[in-house]
Amino acid sequence: MSSRARLSRVSIAALLVSVAFSGFARAEMAISANDGKVKLVDGVVQVQKDGKDTVSFIDLDANPPKVVAEIEAPTSVVGPPMSVAVGPKEDFAIVTGAMKVSPADPTKQIPDNKVTVIDLATEGAGIVGTLKKATGIGTPAAPRTPKILATLEAGAGAAGVSINKTGTLALVANRNEGTVSVFTIAGKTLTAAGKVDLGNKDAGPSHVVFTPDGKSALVSRDADHKISVLSIDGAKVEYTKRDMNAGLRPYGLDISGKGDVAVVANIGIGQGDNDTVSVIDMAATPSRVVSTVTVGQTPEGIKMSPDGKFVAVAVMNGSNKPAASPFYKANGLLQVYSRTGTQLAKFAEVPVGKWCQGIAWTSNSRKLAVQCMVDEQVQVFNWNASKLTTAGTVKTTGGPAGIRTAEK
């Protein structure tokens, strides 16, 4: 080999290392939990006897976006669409399953408590594999299909799940027993570390999210209309007895990357009224609800952009109702609100599919993915900080019911 060729290969390797550590060598994945047990037929949920739940791994960097792998794992559309959490290193994910088909009556569902841990490691798609392929030094390993590492138990109706920024603790909201399950994390191994009792077995804890410093968390309680504050010290998690009130049935919940504000989607009672999104001032002592905006019928999904400038909301808009209902609309809505301090203002809106669920942003705040249950697809949009444009549509096996990207 000539010295020029060797130099060229070294230069390529150096360039790839530079690109890799700039965050561009690895595809950005959204993980979608898909409920195959139920379908919505003219506004009525019907249980599917032989339906299979799946988890899809979606490459959002591809043009158009595409599913690169799919495995079976228990999940559920019941509960907020935050039934997925991704480790900060993107090496593992957690998926919860709030409901299962009743063994006694296959036309009905009963609460489940499943927590599935999934290995996401793929050397062939990462920095090492990229360098090997480009430089010819060694043989790159083939990308591995994500695999289930463990299936654990939380509480009845295991729904919203989050992982702290250091990847050492996970919390799961248990809708059917009024508790939050605590799991410690070592590498990719989860260990049950007890439960937090919220003082009301019928509270309906829906989602739980950490503050960026990991010292506290918020829990939405849609059955008794509260948002509770938890304190965290290592693996010790306690209910502080501090509750906030935002609106009817607080459900989806998110906290900004800086931890200065939180947003909560109040889904209401589903009777055709316009529902709301509230902003919580996390910098105040104590934290408190400070503003609310009207968004439309049933804001199921909510997610702040990683740069903290925008809030995306998936509004059902009556698309989940019978066609004969006076509140029925043929499509849902994806809305984007700009944020100034603790105030939100509608900035953009596009129609999406029916009975839409979760939302995920890419880490650069330039793409949005929204799940639509009836259509069994994830719609992906480009976002240039002023306008939403279609980037592509991804089909899933089963109705997409929960979605997340890594939150670093």
Model-predicted segments: where are they?
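Bacterial N-terminal signal peptides that target proteins for export
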Residues: M1-A13
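Predominantly soluble domains enriched in secretory-pathway, periplasmic, or organellar proteins
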Residues: R4-R6, V19, G23-K408
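Hydrophobic helical h-region of N-terminal Sec-dependent signal peptides
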Residues: S11-F21
